[in-house]
């Protein structure tokens, strides 16, 4: 069981306690600090929709420290980030790998950041299937189509030519924060709010 810190606030009605993530949500901050799967995607999508309903004109920040995960779950988050009215700023703390890196790049242009010692890793989709030959062929075609879709979006988000994105995502491609900026995945490396 994960330990979640509690924050206590004084209000006119007494003390109020929040888990740290609920308190951050009040400040329009979402933390993606786990593998991306259907559960984390549902929670993140719900938080994005809630914050849009609260104030459709105020930016939302997503802090990312994720090894990546499910493509379909990640695309649910990506589509929602683009669907809602507020700009979504993304900040990499630690590591944004695979779908985590994709979501980092999906932030609003000019509002994608990484801390100085953060790392970013992109690669092609991973897949594995068992079964009859025809089923394996169907899954292989699907994963190639997903790879092409992800690469096309990375081209749009980074400004890199398709050939470079295809080459770089063929295997694990690691970048330090400054390299992720040069690549176009983020817009700035930030070290302080001062």
UniProtKB/Swiss-Prot annotation:
One Pfam family cited in the UniProt record for this chain: CLP_protease
Localization annotation: Cytoplasm
Active site per UniProt: 98, 123
Record key words, sorted: Cytoplasm, Hydrolase, Protease, Serine protease
GO cellular component terms, semicolon-separated: cytoplasm; endopeptidase Clp complex
Molecular function terms from GO: ATP-dependent peptidase activity; ATPase binding; serine-type endopeptidase activity
Catalytic activity: Hydrolysis of proteins to small peptides in the presence of ATP and magnesium. alpha-casein is the usual test substrate. In the absence of ATP, only oligopeptides shorter than five residues are hydrolyzed (such as succinyl-Leu-Tyr-|-NHMec, and Leu-Tyr-Leu-|-Tyr-Trp, in which cleavage of the -Tyr-|-Leu- and -Tyr-|-Trp bonds also occurs)
Enzyme Commission number(s) of this protein: 3.4.21.92
Top-tier EC class: hydrolase
Gene3D superfamilies with a match to the protein in the record: 2-enoyl-CoA Hydratase, Chain A, domain 1
InterPro entries xref list: ClpP, ClpP/crotonase-like_dom_sf, ClpP/TepA, ClpP_His_AS, ClpP_Ser_AS
Chief location category: cytoplasm
Disulphide connectivity of cysteines: none
One record GO biological process: protein quality control for misfolded or incompletely synthesized proteins
Family: Belongs to the peptidase S14 family.
Task performed by this protein: Cleaves peptides in various proteins in a process that requires ATP hydrolysis. Has a chymotrypsin-like activity. Plays a major role in the degradation of misfolded proteins.
Subunit organization: Fourteen ClpP subunits assemble into 2 heptameric rings which stack back to back to give a disk-like structure with a central cavity, resembling the structure of eukaryotic proteasomes.
Protein name from the UniProt record: ATP-dependent Clp protease proteolytic subunit
């Amino acid at each position: 069981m994960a330990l979640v810190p509690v924050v206590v606030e004084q209000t006119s009605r007494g003390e109020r306690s929040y888990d740290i993530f609920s308190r951050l949500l009040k400040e329009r901050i979402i933390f993606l600090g786990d593998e991306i799967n259907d559960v984390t995607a549902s929670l993140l999508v719900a938080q994005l929709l809630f914050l849009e309903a609260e104030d459709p004109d105020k930016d939302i920040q997503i802090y990312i420290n994720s090894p990546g995960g499910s493509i379909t779950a990640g695309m649910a988050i990506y589509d929602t980030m683009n669907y809602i009215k507020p700009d979504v700023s993304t900040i990499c703390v630690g590591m944004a790998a695979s779908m985590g890196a994709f979501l980092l790049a999906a932030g609003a242009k000019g509002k994608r950041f990484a801390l100085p010692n953060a790392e970013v890793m992109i690669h092609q989709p991973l897949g594995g299937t068992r079964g009859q030959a025809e089923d394996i062929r169907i899954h292989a075609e699907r994963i190639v189509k997903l790879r092409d879709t992800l690469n096309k979006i990375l081209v749009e988000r980074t400004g890199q030519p398709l050939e470079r994105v295809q080459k770089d995502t063929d295997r694990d491609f690691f970048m330090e924060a400054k390299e992720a900026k040069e690549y176009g995945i983020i817009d700035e490396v930030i070290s302080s709010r001062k």
